[in-house]
Amino acid sequence: MQRAVLHCIVKGPAHTRIDKTARMREPMTDNDSGTFPSQPYWETKKLAEMSREEWEALCDGCGKCCLHKLQDEDDDFVYYTSVACRLLDCETCQCKDYPNRTVHVPDCVQLSRENVDTLNWMPSTCAYRLLSEGKGLPDWHPLVTGNRESTFMAGMSVRGMVISEDDAHPDLTRYIVKWPA
């Protein structure tokens, strides 16, 4: 039996988890007549049309994008590991230095409107990925629930389930997980 060769492909972008949910869910008039939009912005706007604040609020704080991933050379399958970027606070799922993350972790991928469609390794539950694929947000998403803890409460966060790369064995295959990705 031949063993698959896996390579670390990405550590992923680390997003700050600023609680803007309440403000994002407040009704805002969308025209001079003072009428209120009938649908939330993520259901009416394309990713490219969103403001920076709206874009950042899409992050559900799961931390999965900040995990080391391995890609099989033979079939390109991406495996998630339980090893997090050294900047991810494993208990809060927040980046320890979001504004300067690419200085500390040069291969940290910055998710953007330009590259969101090309990053097929993003978690299947990621709001950016879901919206780029024309899908809606899951019921547990903080923008839907109005509660930043809903990702964790739904079991969709890596909070408390991962270790820092600083504490991991160099053989990342030891840490491959089968969580929902």
Residue map of PLM features:
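Cationic, low-complexity basic patches in intrinsically disordered or flexible, solvent-exposed regions
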Residues: 2-3, 27
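N-terminal leader/targeting segments
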Residues: 3-5, 13
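Short loop/turn segments that flank or connect secondary-structure elements
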Residues: 25, 29-61, 70-181
